């Protein structure tokens, strides 16, 4: 009963917050873009405004989808989120093909299917939350009043995690503003590399969800030896998966780039960065982003947040600006700053993990 009440409070609060953020972005999109990216080409700014305005209308749907997806994962119902995510992506891809290649809508042709797919996914997964056979469901829980005690408990975990993610995304935007000054070839190469990089890290994304669930159970049972064992095992499996994909992407980078219709300069730059990323990701990504999930699962949320914000801003953002505006190194240096950020995170997280403070934190909580 308490879990069901908490589920609705999470959904209600997230939806309200997403609505407020949407209003801010819609009304202040122009100054926000100029603040983040400064002076960029007029065509790029126009396209950015179009994409931002359209996708901002999907923030509420995204909040509903993410909240419900998290609840299904908490019930070990990851198959539900997989199928809903698949539906969302199919709608998005088909919509992009129709709007871009059929209707020639440009940037709007990318943004509109994205927005529609998010609303479809939000509606579907929200309705699935009303199945009474589910351990956590929303049947009989609909109320428009906030439960203060529940919200406090939720925010205790949500605020550090949300602040970390917010600072991370803001840092990425600021880094993008540096990339935007390098011209359209660099912007295109950076975007394509980012897409391929996400493929490279897919095993890590999947295993990270498992780490949170498995370690939470171990910590709840007081079996910290098991928490450490499964952290090592899952991180090892993820690194093997990422390593295999890294080899494939390193060798096939010239072929993959041909699917994106890039110019010669952008294509060559993309191949170079994809290969550098493949090597770095195989060794650095999982310790930097998997180990902190063990700490969070044990209730140690402030330390990962502090390290992530410190490393992101001091190393990735500041170094990116130094490399770009002081040293004039180009796009590759932007990604090198990111890899340095990963190394710093890895050092701090592994040292914390090897100690016992996070275990004591779990016992107190």
Where are these regions (language model features)?
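Short alpha-helical transmembrane segments in multi-pass integral membrane proteins
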Residues: 1-58, 102-159, 215-281, 324-365
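Small-residue-rich hydrophobic transmembrane alpha-helices
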Residues: 1-23, 62-81, 176, 187-253, ...
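Residue-level hotspots within pore-lining transmembrane alpha-helices
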Residues: 20, 24, 56, 60-61, ...
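Hydrophobic/aromatic end-of-helix segments at the C-terminal termini of transmembrane alpha-helices
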Residues: 29-32, 95, 170-179, 183, ...
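Transmembrane helical elements of multi-pass membrane transporters/channels
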Residues: 54, 65, 88, 117-121, ...
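Short runs within selected transmembrane alpha-helices of multi-pass transporters and secretion channels
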Residues: 54-73, 81-92, 110-125, 204-208, ...
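Short loop-to-helix capping motifs
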Residues: 77-78, 106, 183-184, 263, ...
């Amino acid at each position: 009963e308490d879990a069901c009440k908490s589920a609705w409070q999470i959904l209600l609060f997230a939806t309200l917050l997403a609505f407020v953020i949407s209003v801010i972005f819609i009304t202040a999109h122009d100054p926000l873009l100029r603040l983040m990216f400064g002076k960029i080409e007029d065509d790029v700014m126009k396209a950015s405004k179009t994409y931002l305005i359209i996708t901002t209308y999907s923030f509420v749907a995204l909040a509903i989808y993410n909240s419900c997806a998290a609840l299904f994962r908490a019930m070990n119902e990851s198959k539900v989120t997989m199928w809903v995510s698949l539906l969302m992506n199919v709608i998005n891809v088909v919509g992009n093909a129709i709007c871009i290649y059929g209707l020639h809508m440009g940037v709007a042709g990318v943004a509109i299917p994205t927005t529609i797919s998010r609303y479809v996914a939000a509606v579907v997964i929200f309705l699935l939350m009303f199945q009474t056979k589910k351990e956590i469901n929303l049947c009989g829980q609909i109320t428009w009043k906030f439960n203060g005690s529940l919200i406090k408990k939720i925010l205790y975990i949500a605020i550090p995690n949300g602040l970390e993610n917010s600072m991370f995304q803001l840092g990425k935007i600021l880094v993008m503003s540096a990339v935007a000054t390098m011209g359209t070839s660099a912007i295109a190469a950076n975007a394509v590399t980012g897409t391929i990089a996400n493929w490279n890290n897919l095993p890590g994304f999947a295993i990270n969800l498992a780490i949170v669930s498995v370690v939470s159970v171990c910590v709840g049972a007081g079996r910290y030896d098991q928490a450490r064992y499964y952290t090592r095992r899952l991180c090892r499996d993820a690194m093997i998966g990422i390593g295999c994909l890294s080899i494939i992407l390193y060798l096939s980078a010239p072929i993959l780039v041909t699917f994106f219709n890039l110019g010669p300069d952008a294509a060559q730059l993309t191949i170079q960065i994809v290969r550098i990323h493949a090597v770095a990701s195989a060794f650095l990504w999982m310790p930097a982003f998997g180990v902190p999930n063990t700490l969070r699962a044990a209730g140690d949320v402030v330390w990962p947040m502090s390290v992530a914000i410190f490393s992101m801003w001091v190393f990735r953002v500041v170094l990116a600006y130094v490399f770009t505006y002081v040293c004039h190194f180009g796009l590759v240096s932007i990604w090198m700053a990111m890899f340095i950020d990963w190394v710093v995170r890895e050092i701090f997280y592994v040292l914390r993990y090897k100690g016992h403070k996070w275990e004591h934190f779990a016992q107190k909580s």
